[in-house]
Amino acid sequence: MTNVAVLSESELGSEAQRERRKRILDATLAIASKGGYEAVQMRAVAERADVAVGTLYRYFPSKVHLLVSALGREFERIDAKTDRAALAGGTPYQRLNFMVGKLNRAMQRNPLLTEAMTRAFVFADASAAGEVDHVGKLMDSMFARAMSDGEPTEDQYHIARVISDVWLSNLLAWLTRRASATDVSKRLDLAVRLLIGTEEQPKI
């Protein structure tokens, strides 16, 4: 299947178009928050966003594109609200644990919404490759910048990719009730320790 282009915010020429895209994603998040993945239907999103269904499809070709784009926006929001002072100083272990904990709390706050966005991300096909890649890079960047006290190194980006995969795997385990929130925290702490060490025994 070929990649289907989604109109990103940077590609929208007018303020009206950017506002319309924002309304569409707001509507998607609101519907998913109350009903999960199955509740996100294109017609329902169009009605809540006050746009024509045809217009919605020009912005987002499917509900998968919608939900993966919504996940990307949520990560951007979390990143923008992160207290950089809390990430300053300390060790890579402390800073990365802070970021992992922040993401865990954000995603566990609304299980239905998280289930909808994560399900779309995990099962997206090649047509949504651009959106999936964007979300993956956002995760990697957040973790890599948390590890680094400046510009992340190539090795830190590689480690961040592994942390992203472990984090997503454990988020899925929590969503499917195969792991508790405590289990997830312990597993991720172990992964971080193995990859970058602790305050007493740093590896990077």
Curated annotation (Swiss-Prot):
It holds the Pfam family TetR_N. InterPro entries: Homeodomain-like_sf (IPR009057), HTH-type_TetR-like_transc_reg (IPR050109), HTH_TetR (IPR001647), KstR_C (IPR041642). GO terms for biological process: regulation of DNA-templated transcription. Residues 41-60 bind DNA. GO terms for molecular function: DNA-binding transcription factor activity; transcription cis-regulatory region binding. Residues 18-78 form the HTH tetR-type domain. Keywords: DNA-binding, Repressor, Transcription, Transcription regulation. The keyword DNA-binding applies. Homodimer. Controls the expression of genes used for utilizing diverse lipids as energy sources. This is HTH-type transcriptional repressor KstR. It comes from Mycolicibacterium smegmatis (strain ATCC 700084 / mc(2)155). The gene is kstR.
